[in-house]
Every structure is written in C-alpha cells, then in structure tokens.
C-alpha cells in the first residue's frame, strides 16, 4: 500500500468525517490536497440533474466524490487500484447517507466501457479529473473515447487535466 494511502486511512479512522480537525492537527501538503473541501470548487458551480448518475474516473482520495454523491442519485467510483478505492470507502464510512450512494469498481476505463456496452450501462455524467493515466497520446485518446462511450445520449463529460501552469489546481482541484 502506498504510504499516503496508509496515512489517509489512518486519518479517516481517527477523525471520521471531521476533515477540518484532521487538517488542523496534521499539517502536511499532501493531506491538504486530499482532504480540503476547497477541492470541490472545481465542480461546485455545475448545475447537476439530481436524477442522474455519475461515473467518477479515478478515486482521487474521494475529493470530489462527496459533492457528486450529495448532488446526484448515485456515483460509481472507477479506479485501477483497490487501494485507492479503499481510501474513498474510509472517507465516507462515517457518513452513511453518502456511503449508500457510492459504488466502487476496480478496473481501467477501457475495460469498464467494454463491459458496460454489453450490459447497457451509461451515465448522465462522466467525471475525469486529472486521471489520464496513459503515457502516450494514443492511449489518452483511447481513455477519452472510452469515457465518452459511458455517457448516456444527452450526458455530460466533465474533464480537467493537470497541466504545466497548474490551472486545474488554482481552480480548486
């Protein structure tokens, strides 16, 4: 298990949903990045249809999962690492109303899209925040194509990528 994931799980176990207290008592930039409510600013302005479901590609310590769960009927968190998914599970363990709306899937987006196509599963929102994991342009294009395939007919793809200027981060993500 990655050290940061172990540390975050320990914080969630100790502080539950009191992330502000966890941050006050544990001053580390990596904790701030993972736990700060400010990260929700990236999507806070979006007017979501509460009847829709979202697919969040990349667990990202659950930084945006809570906002999606509060605003939508359900959220599926897709990540290639079971360890990353466990961090999100622990984050919402003490918030049963949100935890009940979150589903976890350990897979890559391309495999998940192929499986979803067979069973007809699509989402009103697909959220891809900085999780383009392929090293080359063709691989990233394949990931975006797979994300698009997971959208319902009138669905919305929300994407924000890390960049040299840190604009994503200045926006709160």
Where are these predicted regions, by residue range?
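Conserved SAM-binding loop
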Residues: 88-89
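Conserved class I S-adenosyl-L-methionine
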Residues: 50-60, 159-173
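Conserved SAM-binding strand-loop segment of SAM-dependent methyltransferases
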Residues: 97-111
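Conserved alpha-helix/loop element of class I SAM-dependent methyltransferases that forms part
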Residues: 33-52
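Conserved SAM-binding loop of SAM-dependent methyltransferases across substrates and taxa
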Residues: 61-72
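Conserved SAM/SAH-binding beta-strand->alpha-helix loop
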Residues: 81-83
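A short glycine-rich, Lys/Arg-flanked "PGG" loop and its adjoining helix->strand segment in the class I
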Residues: 139-156
């Amino acid at each position: 298990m990655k050290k940061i994931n172990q540390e975050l799980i320990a914080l969630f176990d100790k502080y539950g949903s009191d992330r502000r207290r966890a941050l006050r008592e544990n001053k580390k930039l990596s904790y701030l990045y993972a736990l700060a409510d400010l990260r929700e600013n990236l999507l806070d302005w979006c007017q979501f249809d509460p009847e829709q479901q979202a697919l969040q590609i990349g667990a990202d310590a659950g930084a945006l999962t809570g906002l999606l769960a509060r605003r939508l009927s359900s959220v599926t968190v897709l990540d290639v690492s079971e360890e990353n998914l466990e961090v999100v599970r622990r984050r919402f363990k003490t918030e049963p109303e949100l935890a009940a709306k979150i589903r976890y899937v350990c897979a890559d987006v391309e495999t998940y899209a192929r499986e979803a196509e067979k069973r007809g599963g699509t989402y009103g929102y697909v959220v891809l925040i900085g999780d383009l994991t392929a090293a080359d342009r063709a691989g990233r294009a394949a990931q975006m194509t797979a994300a698009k395939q997971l959208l319902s007919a009138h669905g919305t793809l929300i994407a924000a990528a890390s960049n040299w200027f840190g604009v994503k981060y200045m926006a709160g993500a």
